[in-house]
């Protein structure tokens, strides 16, 4: 997802999406360890989406409402 798509979401949606992304990342890491995962570029995509969501959550908490 693009950061613009994340900006339209609420804090609760972002937190839920972050949990989903972390589960997906864990699953991918386990598949890589077992040698079953071939699309390694997906790991990078998930890692960057996690960073985007974490940035937005910290930005929201930092700015006064």
From Swiss-Prot:
The keyword Transferase does not apply. Pfam families: Ribosomal_L29 (PF00831). Coiled coil: none annotated. GO terms for molecular function: structural constituent of ribosome. GO terms for biological process: translation. It comes from the Bacteria. GO terms for cellular component: cytosolic large ribosomal subunit. Keywords: Ribonucleoprotein, Ribosomal protein. PANTHER family: 60S RIBOSOMAL PROTEIN L35/50S RIBOSOMAL PROTEIN L29, LARGE RIBOSOMAL SUBUNIT PROTEIN UL29C. Belongs to the universal ribosomal protein uL29 family. HAMAP family: Ribosomal_uL29 (MF_00374). NCBIfam families: L29. This is Large ribosomal subunit protein uL29. It comes from Xylella fastidiosa (strain Temecula1 / ATCC 700964). The gene is rpmC.
């Amino acid at each position: 997802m693009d950061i613009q798509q994340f900006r339209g979401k609420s804090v609760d949606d972002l937190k839920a999406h972050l949990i989903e992304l972390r589960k997906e990342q864990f699953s991918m890491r386990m598949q890589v360890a077992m040698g079953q995962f071939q699309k390694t570029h997906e790991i990078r995509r998930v890692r960057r989406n996690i960073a985007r969501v974490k940035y937005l959550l910290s930005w929201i908490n930092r700015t006064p409402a």
